Regions:
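Short, mixed-charge low-complexity intrinsically disordered segments
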Residues: 3, 58-71
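Short aromatic-glycine-(Arg/Gly/Cys) micro-motifs in beta-strand/loop hairpins
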Residues: 16-35
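A short, charged, amphipathic alpha-helix used as a generic interaction element across diverse proteins
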Residues: 43-64
Length: 71
């Protein structure tokens, strides 16, 4: 299992007629202790965070093997 957290900054706020643009920072816990930044257009900051974490998990799962700590 890949554990990750995210913070979201609003670039352009969402409105009832327009989706917003968000900057999402995602970081994982060891052995996937990387940080990634994504710019995501979504209906809300919550959805942007969920999409950012999903992208992060997909990237980490695509790695050939988990990184080894201390090397």
């Amino acid at each position: 299992m890949i554990l990750a957290s995210a913070t979201v900054d609003v670039i352009t706020p969402n409105t009832p007629k327009r989706i917003g643009n968000f900057r999402v920072e995602v970081w994982g816990k060891a052995p996937y202790d990387f940080v990634r930044h994504y710019e995501i257009m979504a209906q809300s900051d919550t959805i942007a965070a969920q999409q950012g974490i999903a992208r992060f998990v997909a990237e980490m799962e695509a790695m050939p093997e988990p990184p080894v700590q201390g090397s």
